[in-house]
Amino acid sequence: MENKKKDKDKSDDRMARPSGRSGHNTRGTGSSSSGVLMVGPNFRVGKKIGCGNFGELRLGKNLYTNEYVAIKLEPMKSRAPQLHLEYRFYKQLGSGDGIPQVYYFGPCGKYNAMVLELLGPSLEDLFDLCDRTFSLKTVLMIAIQLISRMEYVHSKNLIYRDVKPENFLIGRPGNKTQQVIHIIDFGLAKEYIDPETKKHIPYREHKSLTGTARHMSINTHLGKEQSRRDDLEALGHMFMYFLRGSLPWQGLKADTLKERYQKIGDTKRATPIEVLCENFPEEMATYLRYVRRLDFFEKPDYDYLRKLFTDLFDRKGYMFDYEYDWIGKQLPTPVGAVQQDPALSSNREAHQHRDKMQQSKNQSADHRAAWDSQQANPHHLRAHLAADRHGGSVQVVSSTNGELNTDDPTAGRSNAPITAPTEVEVMDETNCQKVLNMWCCCFFKRRKRKTIQRHK
């Protein structure tokens, strides 16, 4: 092919040659001659549907199968690149239950791109849908699955370190895994078994905070190295968040982020488990007491923890039928999903202007605690409304970039340039990433109820 004049804003104009395989690829891809941005040989990039601590998320389409996918894009010049590491962790995890499938990783112009399975709404989105309280039955069905999910992650020599409702998603409506709770976003994960020595990482103190302050373990607040016990304690805090509707350490005020995180940690330590779990089954307190007493190196007894909740589940006479509290409700269809809101489409410029104004007002937002050389990024406008409810604030960006065909949201030729959101160093513990935290887009107004085999 003849050399073309260089253009700083465009990648290679050639269409990548078709390939039947997906996975890691070192060949760069970019805009085709038709102006459509491509990732790999067969993934077309569509509209922006969200952003996170990696960069931004785009809707995509596999041109070979006509299936929609999620495409994570991270600037190659990122100060703390993590997408390649996350890809390696996904490959390490393989195809376990509730683990998103990864289809491709490779360069895309000035970006690294990872193509993943597209999932449904997050537990935080569904929590909002259910008036911010889950029933005991729903929490137990979630808990039983997530203990197994975390056990699987740990079995692959990884600790997760980022427990929060926004990182647990149901499957896409109509999919056979639509009621399975998936775990996503391994940007903060870490190997706790040294791959060379095969030994557990050493115990250390004076570590910087990594994770989401609202849910992280007490030992993490104290600067102790995280291990398997901390993932399970964070899950316990999240379970109580679902049952109670909020946690005692939410909404604390302080002059600085450091003081705020200190207050959160102090309040966690000062809140007896009996008080935190008051008016709820004793098993909730038993769970937290057990995980908080674990030694740094100790392997948790996952079967014991699961049995706590399965026995309670059976004693209450519940059936594991996946009839969650949100079943029968209309699932959220966020701005930027496949189904365009006509009003939003016709008033795109007004919405973009509003989003820019909101972004300028929230530059000093205190968002989730993600030190350890990690990055954070602005989130969707809906998150701002939720953050107000919790006394927090977040940065906002528009997620409606690009004019896209309503029949095929990845077919647009006038997508706005992919730009990296403003980088900041810390984020507030409210971490209201909402619908667009990862690839949680809903493509159908109503879901089909479908009973699937019980997950352990």
Swiss-Prot record:
* Localization per record: Cytoplasm
Q: Which SMART domains does the record associate with it?
A: S_TKc
PROSITE patterns reported in the protein's UniProt record = PROTEIN_KINASE_ATP, PROTEIN_KINASE_DOM, PROTEIN_KINASE_ST
UniProt-annotated catalytic positions: 162
Ranges of Polar residues composition bias in the record: 22-35, 395-417
Keywords, in A-Z order = Acetylation, ATP-binding, Cytoplasm, Kinase, Nucleotide-binding, Phosphoprotein, Serine/threonine-protein kinase, Transferase, Wnt signaling pathway
Residue sites binding ATP per the record:
49-57, 72
List the catalysed reactions.
Answer: L-seryl-[protein] + ATP = O-phospho-L-seryl-[protein] + ADP + H(+); L-threonyl-[protein] + ATP = O-phospho-L-threonyl-[protein] + ADP + H(+)
Stretches for region Disordered: 1-35, 342-375, 392-418
Q: Which cysteines are joined by disulfide bonds?
A: none
Reported modifications of this chain = Autophosphorylated.
Q: What protein is this chain from?
A: Casein kinase I isoform gamma-3
User: Gene encoding this polypeptide?
Assistant: CSNK1G3
